Amino acid sequence: MTGRKFCRIWTIVYSIVLTAFTAWILSDTFIIPDDVVEMPEQAEETGVDNTQAGAVVTDTSYKDDNISITITTKRYKDTNVYIADVVLSDASYLKAGLAQNKFGRNIKATTSDTAEQCNAILAVNGDYYGYRDYGYVMRNGYLYRTVRGYEKINEDLVIYDDGDFEIANESAVTAEEIEAKGAVQIFSFGPGLVNNGVKTVDEDYEVTQSMLSNPRCAIGMIEPLHYVFVVSDGRTDESKGLGLSDLAQVMLDAGCTVAYNLDGGGSATMWFMGKVINYPTTGGEYHERRVSDIVYIGE
């Protein structure tokens, strides 16, 4: 066999192997379910209607003895922004839901489907934990993942059993230490937007795409049991989108003392009483992305 012929054969074989390996990596990242864990029985929903008898419901509000939700829409920076003001009688009504009621990579469903599964009243997409194999994950008191993130700053949102919020840095505390303090939820997307009533990001904050205008999603606390859910549209002719600094300002203007950035872009979705409130997009077209998890309000 001549050297030239050998080189051609080797090139073909190498190309086939490289293509197969690339396909496997993409499938492992986006398609193949991995490390699947069923949600603990105590965290599963009952499958009954979450709305209380006698609840007063409109297109933009819900009120019963335990939950009060009011949704408003405003224009900010040439963008439609949807703001849900939530007041609860108990922190247990603020919950997290997993797609298909399972934890694992590539276990996905739309925010709408997971909200229906959980019998939610109000829901937004979560931190899309399944897109990464690192970052602390706790849902409804169950600690699923304890692997620290790789970045210098990995800010998590911790929600405690009394309804208080805290921004925690994974480099400074373990997931087990957070759990021991009474945490019930840990989200690991970030960054934090507001802490102690002070905006913690600005236009120069170095986060991938942070200074670009995108659809956004955030959750904040005014005080324990009083929360704000925010989703903005973006990437359309009608709505430009927000940068992180813009999003932080929206949360401050809503009265938040603590606020945290959740997964945005095509994931950004707000759902209320069976309907998507905002305009989620992919490639400029209406499309509700399938994601790993949601944050929601429910009985």
Regions from the language model: what does each represent?
Residues 99-103, 171-175, 232-236:
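Short, solvent-exposed aromatic-acidic interface loops
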Residues 62, 129-210:
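Active-site-adjacent helix-turn-beta-strand microarchitecture at beta-sheet edges
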Residues 79-81, 117-118, 152, 188, ...:
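Extracytoplasmic
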Residues 79, 91, 164, 221-228:
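Beta-strand-turn-beta hairpins that frame and shape the catalytic cleft
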Residues 85-87, 124-126, 160, 220, ...:
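Short beta-strand segments
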Residues 2-150, 166:
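Zymogen propeptides
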Residues 133-151, 204-257, 262, 267-299:
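Conserved, well-ordered active-site substructure
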Residues 122-126, 159, 167, 258-262:
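General beta-strand structural signal in soluble alpha/beta enzymes
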